[in-house]
Curated annotation (Swiss-Prot):
This is tRNA modification GTPase MnmE. GTP binds at residues 226-231, 245-251, 270-273, 335-338, 358-360. It is an enzyme of class 3 (hydrolase). Keywords: Cytoplasm, GTP-binding, Hydrolase, Magnesium, Metal-binding, Nucleotide-binding, Potassium, tRNA processing. Its main location: cytoplasm. (6S)-5-formyl-5,6,7,8-tetrahydrofolate binds at R23, E80, K120, K454. CDD domains: trmE (cd04164), TrmE_N (cd14858). Mg(2+) binds at S230, T251.
Length: 454
């Protein structure tokens, strides 16, 4: 990719609309303005002008905006044509611009990439642009704006600065071992390291919430046939998404519903009843059910309350619980409380959450909704929250691992050189979030997922 080229792309969605925008960025943007507008508009003022073809005829007329670099989104000279949103008109205008030498169609995300490369925004902020466009809820959109304004980046940069300060002390202890003050053993480095680890844990917790807000929580409903799994899916979805009958094994395949609970996206997955398969189709359905369970963020273990009084999942179905990943959160849902007369509500039983409800009548469903929010650490008040991606979580986790290893080197061996290296690696992992340290491959993967005009 040649970043010295002047690029152009449509910045509005394809199709018919009231307004269509073409964006130009690069050194030849001023030349484009002279040839199509007949003049260079006043910087940052809206000029109503005809857009001219090569023969002088008018292709369209509309608003022209001129942003000379470096005071523009990309940091380069930027020109925008805001005309009528007909696809034919926009195509003619685009062809006219591309007929000029040195111009080409922008690659996906190239405008944002140039803004990043020209230090107009960091990598986390650039990703927030795409997240804001793709936001599926009001809370996700607000958190994306926070990320775009630098809330997440500021938290990360504070951690990086703290590590820089800590590394200065450690490097001094290594370089000047004969000094009267032993920086490694006087407790100051240990105290600072503990504080950085604590602050990083807080950022990781907020980032996990931001990731859930962006990507959604995968909740799998599992259990024996006829426990009420499909009825629960319908109750949570608020519509008849799944067929419900008294015939065991009605659900043969995986059913998915995407819902929001107070702005938090959930992917609710209904699975085939787990039992010895009676035919090949059911066997495949059960295999798929286990695949979904093993990939879940949370499992709702549906139990027909009329068949057992047990509340401990290990007593209800020990083989099922034994097969689950140890770290997977499981909530036991005792269904048919309208028949058994059980009190609706949530309680803790032997390390598992237990909810009594009726999927058929809807009693207790709100308790389940509230439980799903709280079990994932989600708070309805996330004014200062930010969105995070999986790569951000991985970088934060890697940084935490290096800090814990550095702590071990400090406390167990007083190994200053090894501690310094772990601090450097932690700092490098954090710097990947904002793009201060990043590979070309990483940048390519991130910006290739953007819209063309961004």
């Amino acid at each position: 990719m040649n970043h010295s080229d002047t690029i152009v792309a449509q910045a509005t969605p394809p199709g018919r609309g009231g307004v269509g925008i073409l964006r130009v960025s690069g050194s030849k943007a001023a030349e484009v303005a002279q040839l199509l507008l007949g003049k260079l508009p006043k910087p940052r003022y809206a000029d109503y002008l005809p857009f001219r073809d090569a023969d002088g005829s008018t292709l369209d007329q509309g608003i022209a905006l001129w942003f000379p670099g470096p005071n523009s989104f990309t940091g380069e000279d930027v020109l925008e044509f805001q005309g009528h949103g007909g696809p034919v008109i926009l195509d003619l205008l685009l062809k006219r611009i591309l007929s000029l030498p040195g111009l080409r169609i922008a690659n996906p995300g190239e405008f944002s990439e140039r803004a990043f490369l020209n230090d107009k925004l960091d990598l986390a902020q650039a990703e927030a642009i795409a997240d804001l466009i793709d936001a599926s809820s009001e809370q996700a959109a607000r958190s994306a704006v926070n990320s775009l304004q630098g809330v997440f980046s500021t938290r990360v940069n504070h951690l990086v600065e703290a590590l820089t300060h800590l590394r200065i002390y450690v490097e001094a202890a290594i370089d000047f071992p004969d000094e009267e003050i032993d920086f490694l053993s006087d407790g100051k480095i240990e105290a600072q390291l503990h504080q950085v680890i604590h602050n990083l844990a807080e950022v990781r917790s907020e980032a996990r919430q931001g990731s859930l807000l962006r990507e959604g929580m995968k909740v799998v409903i599992a259990g024996r046939p006829n426990a009420g799994k499909s009825s629960l899916l319908n109750a949570l979805a608020g519509r008849e998404a799944a067929i419900v009958t008294d015939i065991a094994g009605t659900t043969r395949d995986v059913l998915r519903e995407h819902i929001h609970i107070d702005g938090m996206p959930l992917h609710i997955i209904d699975t085939a009843g787990l039992r010895e398969a009676s035919d090949e189709v059911e066997r495949i359905g059960i295999e798929r059910a286990w695949h979904e369970i093993e990939q879940a963020d949370h499992v709702l273990f549906m139990v027909d309350g009329t068949t057992t009084e047990a509340t401990n999942p290990a007593e209800i179905w020990p083989d099922f619980i034994a097969r689950l990943p140890e770290s997977l959160p499981v909530t036991v849902v005792r269904n048919k409380a309208d028949i058994t007369g059980e009190t609706r509500g949530v309680e803790e039983v032997n390390g598992h959450s237990l909810i009594r409800l009726s999927a058929r009548t809807g009693e207790g469903i709100e308790n389940l909704r509230d439980h799903l929010k709280s079990s994932m650490g989600f708070s309805g008040n996330m004014e200062g929250g930010f969105l995070a991606r999986r790569r951000h979580l991985q970088a934060l986790e890697l940084a935490a691992t290096h800090l814990e290893q550095g702590k071990h080197q400090l406390l167990a061996a007083w190994a200053g050189e090894l501690l310094a290296e772990e601090l450097r690696l932690a700092q490098q992992a954090l710097s990947e979030i904002t793009g201060e340290f990043s590979s070309d491959d990483l940048l390519g993967r991130i910006f290739s997922s953007f819209c063309i005009g961004k």
